[in-house]
Every structure is written in C-alpha cells, then in structure tokens.
Amino acid sequence: MPDQSDKNVILKDFFKSTVLLSELDEILRLKPETLIGIDKVSSDQLITNGIKTIGDLANLSASDLPEIRDILPSMLQKWVKIAQLIHKNVKEQLKRHKKVLMIGLDNGGKTSLLAVVQDKFSIIKSLLPTRGVKREKLDFFGYPIISWDLGGQIMYREKLYFNRPELFFTEADIVLYVIDSQDPDRFTEAANYFREVLKVLIELKENPEFLIVISKSDQDIRKTLQWQQNVTNIKNKFSKVIKEFEQFSIDFCDTTVFQWETVMQMFSIALKKVSDTSEIIENILEEFTDQVDAKAASLVSMDGLIFGNYTDSETDEMLVNNTALLLQTLSNFYNSIGLVREKSIKLDLPLNGFTVRGEKLFEYSDLQIPVYLWALVVEPKKLEHKLDYFKQQLLPLINLFL
C-alpha cells in the first residue's frame, strides 16, 4: 500500500506540470483547467454552468450529467470520475490529520502560540497580525495536524469567513478561540464574534470541540487585580454565550508565550479533547497512582505533550506537570550539548516530604520522541516494580492517540 508521500505524487500526476500542489485542502478548490485533459475553453464552459472547482466537478453524478455546450457527455463523464477519484483520495488523506482552527480578534496572540509550539521563539516579536487565512501542515508532537490560523480583522470576518463559511469552518476537530486578556475594551467584541462563529457551526451542522484560550496571561500581569478582573469579565461574557449553545463542549485555559509550559499544557488539553485514547490513558494512570501510592501521575512526551494525568488535587496536578515540563526542558538542553539522555529524572523535595520522578517508558512516532511517566510520590522505589506492566498497556494507546 502506498504511503502518504506516494499518494501525493499520484495526485500530482492528474494535474498540469505548471500547477503547484502545496496544501491538500486547496486541491478541491482548484479550477477544472488545472487538470490534464481540460483546456481553458472547456473549463470556462464548466464555470459558466456553475462548475467552478474540482470539488464541484466531483459532486456531479456520473449517471446524471448536465448538458454543457461543446463538451461531449463521454468527456464530461471521464472528468467527473477523475475528479471523484481525486476527491476521495484527498478526503482520505485529510482524515489522517486533525484540523485545528485558530480563531479570535486580530492581535489576540494566535500566531504567536503556533510559533511557540514550533519552537520559533525568535520570530514572535516581529510577527504581524495574520491577513486572511494561514494554513499549515504541522508535525504537532509527532502527530500530523492541519492548522488554520484565521486573521481576526473585521474585513476578513465579515467579507470572507461568514460569506463562505463552508470553506473555513467545516471538518474542524477542535476550535481554539484566542482572546487577549490585556485588552478589556474588546472583550464584548470578542464575545460577539464567538457567538457568530457558533451560529455558523450550527448552520453547517458542525460540532467540534472548543477551548477558549485566554492569552497574554504573562507572569507579572497575573499577580495584578486588573488581570484577575479581566479574566472574570471574559468568563462571564463568554459563559453567557455558551449558555445559548449547549450542544458544544467548551472549556477555558490561560497561557503566555513567555512560559513555554503554559502553551504546551494548553495544546495538550486541546488534543486530549479530540484523542481516541486519552480517557483510557487516564484510567490507567489512576490505577498506577493507586498501586504506587502516588499523589499524582502524568504521561508526558519529551517535546511537551501531556497525554494524560491523574490526581485528586489540582495543586498536585500543576506540580507534577510543571516539574515534568521544566525538567524535560533541562534534559533536552543536556542532550543538545552531547550528553546521553537519562532514563530516570527526578527532583527530591525532602523538606516537603516527596519526590517528583520521571521514568522513560518508550519512544513513539517516526521522530522517536521519548515518553516519560511522571509521578509525585513519597516512596519513589515503589515505581520500579510497576513500570514494565504499565509500559505494555500505555504504548499502543500512545500510537493511537490521534
């Protein structure tokens, strides 16, 4: 069976040599004349009859074709079948990619969040607001993701997105709605835009997962009364909107690009919402914490994806996750200067009577990304006899996470 790169080559063979196929989701929006065998005159005739794209051509029934002047029925039938073959191939490939939709007002911080998860810290200060739509095929934590970053300027919202919503809001697995926590003058505008997005999704019969991302929650700002009031204001305004649309599952999360771990945790929450195995992973972690008398446990990839965690305490969850992410960052630094990565990483806090310890279980994806099982424990030795048992249970679930 051909792999994805082979299929991309196969798709390219249907198109004229001058056509560049950069993004899968753009293929079905190309004009008919981009296909080999369809000249400009025939393409114009198709467009005149409402068949403007390869997607439109694929939607025709080969057994009930329209009559189009100067185009033989047999020729049209062939083109339709080719378009349908391309359509099927594109849709199959897209199903293997989770679609993440980044929405929010301009200057909200959407593109900066994507830059952090791609380790592009140096470009954040020079980023300009996204104009229109920026689509990227990304390797998120070793999994294929299609990211749609929708610029938030009003002219794009009114004249582009809501004019042709089916082009932008369909087949999204999760929507990240980003709002600037430091811009209270636009909270009402942001909530109204959010409402319009939900209305469009209902009209399109789409039901993606949602995460409202309260961005620019910088560490120094978080300590102020103003920030706390802003967050309360945001949640109040958005909660009123959410009550109007009870069919959606919507959560809140705050981040800052100046603390990498907050961005990783935000994306982890988002991906867990659309994962096929995250719930099972967390059930296994619950069993693990019980057997080793741990206060909390998390399964974390070396590049920052938290596959799942279990604890009875929100404080313990923050403690184990933040410690894991920071110690793994230190491990990555050691590895970058030529040191061998340790299989066991720990931080002892004797005055507090516990240890945070991470044990490497396995690697996943073609990128061979290490995965560590982290636990907040009083007696770390209890972990040693249980690791192989839980490793065998967790490995297949990680491979099927997305």
Predicted regions and their residues:
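Glycine-rich phosphate-binding P-loop
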Residues: 99-119
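Switch II of P-loop NTPase G domains
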Residues: 145-176, 180-200
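Switch I (effector-binding) loop of TRAFAC-class P-loop GTPase G-domains
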Residues: 94, 117-144
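Short hydrophobic alpha-helical segments used for membrane anchoring or interfacial signaling
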Residues: 297-309
